[in-house]
């Protein structure tokens, strides 16, 4: 009888121990999955942003346009303040504008308020890849670096969306650091993949 009691007790301890191990293993797997998912989101978006920067640097606009959101397209903003009424550009329209050398209206110049009417290539050179952002001095994910004198409404315009920023600080002593410049990409998930929905240039304006 005593032997039977000891055997039952040992079996209970064994089962309980195994259950604790199984529960701990499940918790560990859940925690690891959450960490992996968080890292994967950041890494995948940063990889897409880098692909966009490389495409802009080498002027491969087919690749750049392939990153546009398939149905929403991309909104281009020449300054930190995003005009939510400004139309979005689909990839096919962006490429057609390059091929046909069309002049597009991209927004308005800060200060004068005059319409920014430019062909795609000159706009890219002035308001998108105006610096070597692929090798930017500072980079960030979901955080702002450059802060100018215009309202930055990115988070209000694109709540809960991820973005990257590439920033060069000012170098001309004459301007006391105000000649900084930055580029931001905003991404949105579509069919389990991330695509670009906004390209925002920012700088200090007079």
Language-model-derived ranges and their functions:
Residues 9-11:
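Hydrophobic alpha-helical targeting segments used for export or membrane insertion
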Residues 65-145:
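Surface-exposed acidic loop/strand-edge motifs in secreted or periplasmic proteins
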Residues 126, 131-206:
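Short beta-strand edge/turn micro-motifs at domain boundaries
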Residues 18-19, 206:
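Long, low-complexity intrinsically disordered regions enriched in Ser/Thr, Asp/Glu, Pro/Gly
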Residues 13-16:
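C-terminal motif of bacterial Sec signal peptides marking the signal peptidase cleavage site
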Residues 1-4:
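Positively charged n-region of N-terminal signal peptides that target proteins for export
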Residues 21-54, 58, 66, 70, ...:
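Short, low-complexity N-terminal intrinsically disordered segments enriched in polar/charged residues
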